[in-house]
Amino acid sequence: MSDSIDTHNEADISVISYMLDAVRHGASTVHILSDDTDVFVIMVYWCWKAGITTNLQMEKWNGTVLSINATAKNLGDHCCSILAMHALSGCDTTSYPVGKGKVSAIKAMRVVPGKLLHCIGEAEATDLQITKATRTFFLTLYNQSNSVTLDAARYDIYRKRKRPPALKTLPPTERNMYLYGRRAHLQVLLWKAADQADPPAVDVTLFGWEKKMGLKEGEELIMPTQDSSPVALPALLDVVSCGCRAGLKPRTSAKCSCAAAGLACTSYCSCKGNDGICCNILTQQQEHKESDEGSGEDDDRTDEDSEDEEAAFC
């Protein structure tokens, strides 16, 4: 095994580098023990990309052995888009769209026209190509292919619901989609460099990340760039927000403009929808409903997302 290939900062990529090295040295079987979906997806991609016939297996901690070769064969040419799909729908370094799991993401990948997703992770890809690919993927994922932008899709979804949907269930805004697409592009760029001795030298601040000083002296943190633009038109926020706020005598629900409109209060209201301040009974009902549905971060996943995410690819 070559010692010179393990120069990547990510352990997942190092695992793939050693896998490729083992294949080059004539290994008949490469058996990797991992519970990481990222590792599984990257293995499938490289099995297809490099045309590997060596028996590739990934064993999960529960003893389940997954055939990488069979998965790559099942996906066929869609393997070319699998890294982009995985990064856009949530991986170790990117967040995931609430309520949209890998089953939905794979269906969207199969529907996205032609080779549109292929540009993600390619060094020569332009901002325009990455943005178009990311937008198309999310519009497809949310069944909003008739919309031109994600902002329009958000409005359309909100308008068609009988009750206001939780904001976290809406597609990202156009600006956040752009930043998110850049972060996904960078991650796929690194995954696609697993066969190289060194990872590509990049400035992460050009890919939806920003550097900030940590609490410790000399500590530098890399954080996702946050967009400060409004999530909806100011006029719309004025319509669906109330003026109830802390420091004033609590208003009755009947006097709350949101309650009068049949809406729960949100963070855009003066009361911020805060349980200790908000008097809107609809807000309280929504909070209780969300609490009953589950409070953990993983509970935002849909029923299609079992613990065995890899099964969605097979």
Language-model-detected regions and their locations in the chain:
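Noncatalytic, typically N-terminal accessory segments of nucleic acid-processing enzymes
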Residues: 1-98, 102-314
